[in-house]
């Protein structure tokens, strides 16, 4: 179930979300009875799957990473490329139903640059199906990035629904935070208009960035830190300086969820994916 993507990929393209998973979500992987992780729609080459495995092995050496693609040709090519490599990921034909060889429910699922080609109205059903396949305590990250992985965003979803939105950018050369807008997840990219939460967030971030211009004397990182500190006064920011220094900002989903009939569609779990303790404990690599 699913549609073949364009397949664009490259080494370290998804490093930002990999670093986030290995940092803020390490507890989920460590606690899993079966450390199964799925990289859905990995593209024309298997490099992002092996990149993900490398990051997660730092957390859980026995992690079991499976790359799923709806294209049999891509699966065959991945298997051939890594034939004979000890401990290589497993590759199989599959889509949103997450049918992995040998069975099992994944504790982590990454679906990057997959839903971007779908209609916005199809996102909720895809999310629901993917979430239904998660192991207890599992997490789905669904997002997108640019061709070089310098600007990226993703939604984190638990079994009950979406819990957070993360923006992650290369700070060097960043004109303003809203430059990431063209890489918003499909659920939000058409919502960057007045009256929507994500538009308000990006506008507030740009305003805070402008006010923090004097901090730029000490570098873009210090300016970003000042921007995040300012945003935390009025927005439900879930992470802290340890993650901000990496060019990240995570906010509660309820603040940016698409609005319907004048009200936001929200999900407010007791323990979100981007809790502050988890954020501060994350990888600084």
Residue ranges and their predicted role:
Residues 106-124:
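A short SAM/SAH-binding and catalytic strip from SAM-dependent methyltransferases
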Residues 134-148:
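Conserved beta-strand signature within the Rossmann-like core of class I S-adenosyl-L-methionine
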Residues 198-274:
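Conserved Class I S-adenosyl-L-methionine
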Residues 43-99:
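Class I SAM-dependent methyltransferase SAM/SAH-binding core
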Residues 1-35, 39, 44-46:
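Class I SAM-dependent methyltransferase Rossmann-like catalytic core
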Residues 124-136:
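A short glycine-rich, Lys/Arg-flanked "PGG" loop and its adjoining helix->strand segment in the class I
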Residues 149-226:
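A conserved mid-domain beta-alpha-beta active-site/ligand-binding segment of alpha/beta enzyme cores
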Residues 97-109:
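A short acidic, Gly/Pro-enriched loop at the edge of an enzyme's catalytic core
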């Amino acid at each position: 179930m699913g549609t073949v993507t364009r397949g664009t990929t490259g080494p370290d393209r998804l490093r930002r979300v990999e670093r986030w998973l290995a940092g803020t979500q390490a507890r989920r992987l460590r606690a899993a009875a079966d450390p199964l992780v799925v990289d859905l729609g990995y593209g024309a080459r298997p490099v992002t799957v092996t990149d993900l495995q490398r990051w997660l092995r730092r957390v859980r050496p026995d992690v079991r990473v499976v790359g799923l693609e709806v294209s049999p040709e891509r699966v065959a090519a991945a298997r051939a490329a890594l034939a004979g490599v000890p401990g290589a990921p497993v590759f199989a034909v599959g889509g949103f139903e997450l049918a992995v060889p040998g069975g099992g429910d994944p504790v982590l699922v990454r679906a990057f640059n997959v839903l971007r080609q779908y209609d916005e109205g199809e996102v909720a059903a895809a999310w629901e199906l993917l979430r239904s396949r998660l192991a207890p305590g599992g997490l789905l990250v669904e997002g997108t990035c640019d061709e070089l992985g310098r600007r990226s965003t993703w939604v984190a979803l638990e079994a009950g629904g979406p819990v957070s939105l993360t923006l992650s950018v290369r700070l060097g050369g960043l004109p303003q935070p809203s430059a990431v807008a063209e890489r918003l997840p499909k659920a939000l990219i058409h919502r960057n208009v007045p009256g929507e939460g994500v538009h308000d967030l990006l506008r507030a971030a740009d305003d805070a960035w402008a006010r923090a211009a004097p901090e730029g004397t000490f570098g873009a990182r210090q300016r970003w830190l000042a921007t995040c500190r300012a945003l935390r006064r009025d927005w439900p920011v879930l992470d802290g300086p340890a993650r901000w220094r990496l060019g990240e900002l995570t906010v509660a989903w309820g603040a940016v969820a698409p609005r319907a009939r004048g009200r936001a569609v929200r999900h407010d779990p007791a323990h979100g994916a981007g809790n502050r303790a988890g954020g501060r404990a994350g990888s600084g690599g």
